[in-house]
């Protein structure tokens, strides 16, 4: 499909198999999964269903077991996956694994791809991306990175503390950001592949966050003289921040894709309730205040999708996408939050329950305005670039 063209008819055709799979195979399992909690046993079960349907990791390279979908097609598939809180997990297109797959596909050596990317795509293990640190370390400002990598004979020793590391508990390996140390060390950050069995990789407690949609939660991690060989360096030493952009730009957009699907689900549930519930002798959906909530959601869903498809096409055409993805992430994270908030209001008491699913989506989606950079950090960067363009003109 031409990257510059994606029509509603295209989206309907591309998304239909995923839509049918989510409706028939995944949504019926939601309440049981919410009650029991998400774990690797559930992940394996769900991913087997997706594999049987030919829908496992549709966005990943075909040569490593994925579906090989381009980025424009992925915008449709991942939105449909996000229609259920379990959908991205089932289809192996959830964070952080989806972003790590893309990073490995672009940056890793052939040996690293066979060792890490192939089993990750197949769902044989999970991964995590370890950059965020306790203050005053790396967070919204990644250049504040404090984790150190000291060069020794045959490899590196990693030391530092990480937190909010999504999926760390139970992950098979981590991609760790660290700053090289030593007289001949390259400036800047470097990336290292660390196996979960490394004695210096210590996963602590899971942080109790309002979202509950990730297997392995968000954990504190310590690195204490964690030795990795020279073959564990991912990409070029000293180019970790540049390599991180390879991951972060698409990851911002795939977050948008999944959460757009979740927001649409919350809206659909609320509208269905409004159409069938009577209030003060009239259908709820006929009341002016309810109609405003519904209409505003309809408008913002279309606006989110239009912006997302545009930026996905630009990235597919080779645009670096740093600013484009930043703008999309701010707008879509905030708009989907508003959409789900209106859905809660429209659904009333049912809107705050997991039984309606809206409550689950509401708790999960709030963190989207913080993940992959808070809105304020993105706005500051967008504004700086705008001023710089005027000054250069």
What residue ranges belong to the model's regions?
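A short, Trp-centered hydrophobic/proline-enriched beta-strand micro-motif
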Residues: 123-133
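Hydrophobic, small-residue-rich alpha-helical packing segments that form membrane-like cores
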Residues: 136-141, 156
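A short, charged helix-loop
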Residues: 219-246
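A short core secondary-structure module
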Residues: 159-204
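Flexible, small-/acidic-enriched active-site or ligand-binding loops
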Residues: 144, 199-227
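N-terminal glycine-rich flavin-associated loop
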Residues: 89-111, 139-141
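Alpha-helical interface subdomain recognition
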Residues: 1-85, 94, 107-112, 119, ...
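Short glycine/proline-enriched turns and hinge-like loops at secondary-structure junctions
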Residues: 69-70, 140-143, 167-171, 185-188, ...
């Amino acid at each position: 499909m031409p990257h510059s063209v994606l029509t509603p008819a295209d989206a309907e055709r591309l998304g239909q198999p995923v839509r049918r799979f989510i409706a028939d195979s995944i949504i019926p399992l939601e309440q049981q999964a919410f009650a029991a909690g998400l774990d690797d046993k559930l992940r394996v079960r769900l991913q087997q269903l997706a594999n049987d349907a030919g829908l496992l990791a549709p966005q990943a390279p075909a040569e490593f077991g994925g579906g090989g979908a381009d980025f424009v097609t992925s915008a449709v598939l991942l939105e449909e996956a996000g229609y259920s809180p379990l959908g991205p997990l089932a289809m192996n297109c959830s964070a952080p694994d989806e972003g790590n797959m893309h990073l490995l596909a672009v940056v890793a050596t052939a040996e690293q791809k066979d060792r890490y990317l192939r089993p990750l795509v197949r769902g044989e293990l999970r991964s995590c991306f370890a950059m965020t640190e306790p203050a005053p370390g790396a967070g919204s400002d990644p250049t504040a990175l404090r984790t150190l990598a000291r060069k020794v004979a045959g490899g590196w020793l990693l030391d530092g503390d990480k937190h909010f590391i999504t999926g760390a508990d139970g992950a098979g390996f981590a991609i760790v950001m660290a700053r090289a140390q030593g007289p001949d060390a390259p400036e800047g950050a470097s990336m290292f592949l660390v196996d979960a069995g490394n004695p210096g990789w210590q996963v602590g407690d899971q942080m109790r966050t309002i979202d509950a949609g990730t297997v392995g939660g968000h954990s504190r991690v310590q690195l204490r003289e964690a030795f990795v060989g020279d073959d564990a360096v991912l990409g070029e030493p000293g180019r970790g921040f540049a390599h991180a952009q390879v991951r972060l730009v698409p990851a911002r957009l795939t977050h948008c894709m999944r959460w757009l699907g979740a927001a649409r689900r919350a809206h659909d549930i609320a509208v269905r309730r409004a159409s069938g519930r009577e209030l003060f002798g009239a259908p709820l959906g006929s009341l002016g205040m309810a109609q405003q909530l519904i209409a505003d959601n309809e408008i913002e869903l279309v606006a989110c999708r239009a912006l997302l498809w545009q930026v996905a096409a630009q990235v597919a055409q080779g645009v670096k996408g740093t600013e484009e993805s930043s703008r999309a992430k701010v707008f879509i994270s905030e708009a989907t939050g508003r959409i789900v908030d209106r859905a809660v209001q429209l659904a009333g008491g049912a809107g705050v329950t997991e039984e309606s699913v809206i409550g689950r989506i509401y708790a999960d989606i709030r963190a989207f305005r913080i993940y992959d950079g808070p809105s304020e950090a993105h706005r500051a960067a967008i504004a700086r670039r705008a001023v710089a363009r005027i000054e250069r003109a």
